[in-house]
Regions:
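An amphipathic, aromatic/His-enriched active-site/gating alpha helix that lines ligand/cofactor pockets
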Residues: 30-41, 62-99
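Amphipathic repeat-derived elements
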Residues: 21-33, 42-46
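Short, low-order "capping/linker" segments at domain edges
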Residues: 94-111
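Long, hydrophobic N-terminal alpha-helical segment
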Residues: 1-27
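Short, well-ordered beta-strand segments in beta-rich or mixed alpha/beta enzyme
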Residues: 5-9, 43-74
């Protein structure tokens, strides 16, 4: 299954708000239906603390990750709309627009 990995800097002091948002998202009644509808089989979010600040690392296992991102950015369903709004408020990233950087490059895969 194709994988998409992304890293986004977390603005100072915003990690608790991000964690709270994800706790709420995890319990959203539409989460399973929404993720499956986008072809996502697994999605993980990780926080890496660094001296330069926290980083959010997202990993998506999806049928077609780039189509999934496009569909997510245009969806009018409750969960994607709410997710985009929260991510914009917390991280300053507008997921209704094209990604601000090119996709990550895979440089090692084992086995």
């Amino acid at each position: 299954m194709p994988i998409l990995a992304m890293t986004i800097p977390i603005p100072p002091g915003k990690t608790p708000a991000l964690e709270q948002h994800l706790a709420e998202a995890r319990n959203h009644p539409d989460i399973d239906e929404t993720f499956k509808g986008f072809g996502i089989s697994r999605e993980t979010w990780h926080v890496q603390e660094t001296e330069q600040g926290d980083l959010l690392m997202l990993v998506f296992d999806a049928d077609d990750p780039f189509t999934m991102l496009q569909e997510f950015s245009r969806s009018n369903n409750d969960l994607p709309v709410w997710q985009r709004q929260c991510i914009k408020e917390i991280l300053g990233v507008d997921l209704s627009q094209a990604p601000p950087a090119p996709p990550s490059r895979l440089i090692f895969d084992w086995p």
